[in-house]
Amino acid sequence: QFEAAGVKTRVVDDLNEARWRKLVWNIPFNGLAIAAGGIATNRLCAIPRLAEEVRALMHEVQFAASRLGFVIPEKFLRQQFDVTPPMGAYRPSSLVDFLAGREVEVEAIWGEPLRRAQAAGAKVPRLERLYASLKKLTAR
């Protein structure tokens, strides 16, 4: 029905793997857009120290996923980073919510993946720091 209505769809074999692939982009870009002071994704890619942090977080997500049995190729990480600057001054949904004073899905996007990574024995210190920072920034 979605495709009949013109909505592109894609069937995946494993929703958990699809979620970790989505987190490759969401964890760094949604989180750092807030933590870095409310900046758009193109700036996260253009400022060298932030671009390095984005890439490092992507690798932590990839590592955590691997500990859970999901293979996310390096090529996928590069593609996720490379498609972002052409989006322009894109503000991720978490940043939009944060700036509007709405609740940010800190637990769903950062907290739960962190806990699952840790339970699988993955060391993800950058994700730990980002999660702690976002909890403080979004506390009401």
Where do the protein language model's features map onto the residues?
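Internal alpha-helical scaffold of NAD(P)-dependent oxidoreductase catalytic cores
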Residues: 1-28, 32-74
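NAD(P)-dependent Rossmann-like dehydrogenase/reductase catalytic/cofactor-binding core
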Residues: 3, 43, 52-140
